[in-house]
């Protein structure tokens, strides 16, 4: 298994994995995963690190982050490992690769959002040195049709 920065050739596999689960859904009006153009723009950008876990030429996991250099802050947007490959520390390897890249970018703060009831995600982040924050309500407004369901 190899962890590497995502390339444009990885986009379709990332989208297929991302659309295969409901964990990324934030409301019933918004697409459940990133539009293809958004992912392509992220991969081309230096501000949006995306790493993939690859085994036998197949992407089996990914992590997507959004770094804001003005605030020196990163939001981990998504982390996913194919259920058939969980329990092998792949999520930790993806997170470690991301954190190393963020240090290179001079990032000073990293956060992520997840459903309160997603205890496995909460435990994953706690185990990897994150602190549990306060409970929040997700609010959104669609400005472009590409995000409509």
Give residue spans per PLM region:
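Acetyl-CoA-dependent GNAT
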Residues: 5-11, 15-77, 95, 101, ...
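Conserved acetyl-CoA-binding loop-helix of GNAT-fold acetyltransferases
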Residues: 81, 87-100, 127
């Amino acid at each position: 298994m190899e962890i590497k920065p995502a390339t444009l050739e990885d986009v379709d596999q990332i989208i297929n994995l991302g659309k295969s689960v409901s964990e990324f859904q934030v409301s019933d009006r918004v697409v459940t995963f990133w539009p293809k153009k958004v992912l392509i723009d992220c991969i081309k950008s230096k501000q949006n690190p995306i790493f993939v876990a690859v085994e036998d030429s197949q992407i089996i996991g990914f992590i997507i982050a959004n770094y804001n250099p003005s605030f020196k802050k990163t939001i981990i947007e998504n982390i996913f490992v194919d259920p058939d490959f969980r329990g092998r520390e792949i999520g930790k390897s993806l997170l470690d690769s991301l954190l190393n890249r963020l240090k290179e970018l001079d990032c000073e703060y990293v956060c992520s959002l997840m459903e309160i009831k997603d205890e496995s995600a909460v435990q994953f982040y706690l185990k990897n040195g994150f602190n549990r924050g306060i409970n929040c309500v997700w609010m959104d407004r669609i400005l472009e049709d590409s995000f409509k369901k």
